[in-house]
Amino acid sequence: VCSSDLIIGPDKDVPAPDVNTNGQIMAWIADEYAALSGKWEPGVVTGKPLATGGSLGRNEATGRGLLFTLETWCEKNHKKMDGLTMAVQGFGNVGSVGSLLIHRQGVKVVCVGDINGTWYNPNGLDIEAMYVYANSHGRSLKGYTEAGATIIPDMDLFSQDVDVLFMAAMENQLNEKTMELVKAKLVLEGDNEIGRAHV
């Protein structure tokens, strides 16, 4: 942002929080933009704290949007969410919130992977417990244990026989190698780019 040639703005590119950012960093960007442009524009970035013009629903907005996407897919394909199965790659803000909201609609999440490992339980993982654990451990599942869950190789996440593969990790995780493994009927895209050149 430290430039007189502003490439972001409320009517240009509006940054949002992503990997390794948070509300404080978004507030700093908005503050720096105000210093350079000479005016306070709350719409220059999303994800700011409430005290600096943030939105009450921002933390869960992307995850909730993915819930709506899955609901729409179910309606168009004459399926009920209750009883669907899902595997999730990535359990940061998007993955954890999205998984929690989707799970609460009756979807059984059997596999969750993050940078620390991949957990599997054919009877369904305890997403409520995983959500609480991750949010109290810096959005990390490192050290998480659960009765009935096993740690499986990370690549096995892609080959789970599930209805939905929820991609919420870093971009380009689906590629020629991993796409060949996918059995899911739907890839729910919660990351920035799943690897469009290969899909």
Q: Predicted regions: what is each one?
A:
Residues 169-197:
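Rossmann-fold NAD(P)-binding glycine/threonine-rich loop
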Residues 46-49, 54-60, 64-158:
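Glycine-rich phosphate/diphosphate-binding loop of Rossmann-like nucleotide-binding domains
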Residues 160-161, 183:
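Alpha-helix C-terminal capping/helix-to-coil transition sites in glycosyltransferase folds
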Residues 34-46:
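Acidic-glycine-rich active-site phosphate/pyrophosphate-binding loop
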Residues 5-17, 38-41:
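Short secondary-structure capping/junction motifs at helix and strand boundaries
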Residues 163-164, 186:
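Short, Asp-centered acidic motifs that coordinate Mg2+ and/or phosphate
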